[in-house]
């Protein structure tokens, strides 16, 4: 969950999409509960805008006075404006720190969740080292989306295409091997 939260913060900076907004709007708590989120949904539909834009437009509304919504908007605006030319790892660290998310996990006391965030940070650094010219936030998010979409288990009946090497250690009720050449698979050396 913490990795998805962290990636949602990055997606919110890049795309301001509804799914990312819904995931992180109240994590850590910003007093944006169900009633306020429903208000934003209705406003967004009525005014044909995103949930994030709805929040930006409604900051002065009485309903959002006792919330930390203004801080969230300020954070997103400031970091997204300055994300060009910055490293993704630096951006990730800053958003986790300034949003209070990392501190939230520390006070929760879950070392495993903090370790997962550290692993995400390391994977971002690894990506940046091998990324070259295409090492932008949007490229990274597209790269990560490929993994999360392909790794997702739909739980539905489906045909999974993979190499023999990728299937090693997995179990399936039925397996079909295509284009076998005698002497190559299985190898004559085995």
Residue ranges of model-derived segments:
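Conserved helicase C-terminal RecA-like lobe
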Residues: 4-190
């Amino acid at each position: 969950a913490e990795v998805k939260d962290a990636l949602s913060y990055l997606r919110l900076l890049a795309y301001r999409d509804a799914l990312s907004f819904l995931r992180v709007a109240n994590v850590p708590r910003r007093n944006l509960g169900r009633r306020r989120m429903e208000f934003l949904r209705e406003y967004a539909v009525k005014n044909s805008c995103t949930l994030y834009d709805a929040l930006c437009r409604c900051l002065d509304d009485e309903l959002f006075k006792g919330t930390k919504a203004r801080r969230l908007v300020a954070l997103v605006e400031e970091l997204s404006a300055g994300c060009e030319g910055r490293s993704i790892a630096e951006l990730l660290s800053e958003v986790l720190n300034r949003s209070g998310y990392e501190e939230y996990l520390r006070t929760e006391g879950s070392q495993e969740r903090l370790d997962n965030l550290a692993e995400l940070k390391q994977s971002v650094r690894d990506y940046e080292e091998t990324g070259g010219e295409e090492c932008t936030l949007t490229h990274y998010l597209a790269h990560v989306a490929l993994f999360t979409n392909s790794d997702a288990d739909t739980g539905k009946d489906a045909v999974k295409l993979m190499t023999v090497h990728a299937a090693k250690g997995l179990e399936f009720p039925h397996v079909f091997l295509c284009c076998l050449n005698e002497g190559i698979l299985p190898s004559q050396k085995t």
